[in-house]
Design a protein with these regions (language model features):
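N-terminal pre-Walker A segment at the start of P-loop NTPase domains
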Residues: 8-28
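Hydrophobic anchor at the beta1->P-loop junction of P-loop NTPases
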Residues: 39-43
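Conserved lysine of the Walker
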Residues: 49
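Hydrophobic positions on the alpha1 helix immediately C-terminal to the Walker A/P-loop
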Residues: 52, 56
Length: 221
């Protein structure tokens, strides 16, 4: 299922280039789904790839489209089980009912050749029959790490890139930015505590006069 917290409202659109945000606005109309086109989101970890595609997915669901979210690793394991249990055709039939299949983090976890073969079979099965929305930390030039051999890699890229929209999020990690902000706040807080301690020491070095005025205590040395 799509994580509900990854919505369009909670996505920080100011972080991404205007050109990429215009692509998102066009995707929200859903025309790419009717044309069975794909959406590919590339970028470093923590740049909002998953959040963005989940947000688009939620908007498409509101428009009546059938959308399903999978992490790549869990999807591959489900495909592999179906293959071993001789029910691949049934699983593909089930997935074919979806208008959009979101596959998150292709290439994040290294898979065996057999696992990647079932993933390739899925890509081939959905080609021009239903939309895929894919996130990956790896650019196409490194997809041979996923599909293991040049021919399969080229065929996989050909199927997903044909009729596709590519969103590039070459940004600084959002999580890293948040961690740095928190660290900065903590340093500022520590600095304020030091100032406060100094103030309290000055106050403790004096006493109040009977009329309420603060007087400094002088000690003869």
């Amino acid at each position: 299922k799509i994580p509900l917290e990854k919505s369009l409202e909670s996505f920080q659109q100011e972080r991404i280039p205007h050109k990429e945000w215009m692509k998102v606005q066009a995707l929200l109309k859903g025309e790419f789904v009717r044309r069975c086109e794909n959406v590919l989101s590339f970028g470093n970890p923590g740049t909002g790839k998953t959040h963005l595609l989940c947000a688009i997915g939620q908007e498409l669901i509101r428009e009546g489209y059938r959308v399903r979210f999978y992490s790549c690793n869990l999807l591959v394991q489900e495909l592999l089980r179906a293959k071993k249990e001789l029910r691949m055709e049934r699983l593909f039939k089930k997935l074919s009912r979806l208008d959009v299949l979101i596959v998150d983090d292709i290439g994040y976890v290294q898979q065996s050749r057999e696992e990647m073969e079932v993933l390739f079979t899925l890509l081939a099965q959905r080609y021009e029959r239903g939309s895929l929305m894919i996130t990956s930390n790896l650019p196409f030039s490194q997809w041979d790490q996923i599909f293991k051999d040049p021919m399969t890699t080229a065929a996989a890229i050909d199927r997903v890139i044909h009729h596709s929209v590519i969103i590039e999020l070459n940004l600084k990690s959002y999580r890293m930015e948040e961690a740095q902000k928190q660290q900065k706040k903590e340093k500022q807080s520590d600095g304020n505590m030091v100032v406060s301690d100094g103030d309290s020491q000055q106050v403790s070095a004096g006493h109040s006069s009977p009329d309420g005025q603060f007087e400094e205590t002088l000690c003869d040395g």
